[in-house]
Amino acid sequence: MSDKPDLSEVEKFDRSKLKKTNTEEKNTLPSKETIQQEKECVQTS
């Protein structure tokens, strides 16, 4: 066996068989207001 990967499958891959998908952001970052509120809550405790 060689250390090099077999690229024959990659070379003949047909991109037209892929279907388009819509990505959706699942892990949104908190807003600045939310971060500030959490900081204030932690400081007062």
Swiss-Prot record:
Compositional bias per record (Basic and acidic residues), positions renumbered to this chain: 1-27, 35-45
One Pfam family in the UniProt entry: Thymosin
Keywords assigned: Actin-binding, Cytoplasm, Cytoskeleton
Entry's Gene Ontology BP terms: actin filament organization; regulation of cell migration
GO CC term, one of those recorded: cytoskeleton
Induction of expression: Down-regulated by TGFB1.
Coarse class of the protein's main subcellular location: cytoplasm
UniProt note on tissues of expression: Neuroblastoma-specific.
UniProt region (Disordered), positions on chain: 1-45
InterPro entries: Beta-thymosin (IPR001152), Beta-thymosin_sf (IPR038386)
GO molecular function, one term: actin monomer binding
Domain of life: Eukaryota
Localization per Swiss-Prot or TrEMBL: Cytoplasm, Cytoskeleton
Database matches in PANTHER family: THYMOSIN BETA (PTHR12021), THYMOSIN BETA-15A-RELATED (PTHR12021:SF11)
Role this protein plays: Plays an important role in the organization of the cytoskeleton. Binds to and sequesters actin monomers (G actin) and therefore inhibits actin polymerization.
Family: Belongs to the thymosin beta family.
UniProt protein name: Thymosin beta-15A
Species per Swiss-Prot/TrEMBL record: Homo sapiens
Gene it is expressed from: TMSB15A
